[in-house]
């Protein structure tokens, strides 16, 4: 059960990041998706989705590696 939960924790932010990359790519090529009225709004939303997904993924990996004591001294808790 815990492995399934860990997989979901990694897949959901990964999908959000992938959506962000897709929105930024569509903005670059000038394709507007339905809920967005302007390209700049679509590009900004894509960047925000990508940043949030990457933040959650990186935080989860750092938390897991800290727990296993596999990080460099600079990232260890004080």
UniProtKB/Swiss-Prot annotation:
Cellular component annotations (GO), alphabetically ordered: plasma membrane
TM helices/strands, residue ranges: 5-24, 39-61
Topology of the protein relative to the lipid bilayer: Multi-pass membrane protein
Keyword Transmembrane helix in record: yes
Primary localization: membrane
Compartment(s) where it occurs, according to its Swiss-Prot or TrEMBL record: Cell membrane
Keyword field: Cell membrane, Membrane, Transmembrane, Transmembrane helix
Protein name: Uncharacterized protein YqzF
Organism annotation: Bacillus subtilis (strain 168)
């Amino acid at each position: 059960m815990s492995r399934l939960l860990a997989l979901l924790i990694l897949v959901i932010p990964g999908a959000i990041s992938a959506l962000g990359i897709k929105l930024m790519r569509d903005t670059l090529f000038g394709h507007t998706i339905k809920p967005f009225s302007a390209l700049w709004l679509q590009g900004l939303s894509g960047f925000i989705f990508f940043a949030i997904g990457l933040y959650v993924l990186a935080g989860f990996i750092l938390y897991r590696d800290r727990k296993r004591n596999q990080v460099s001294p600079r990232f260890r808790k004080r």
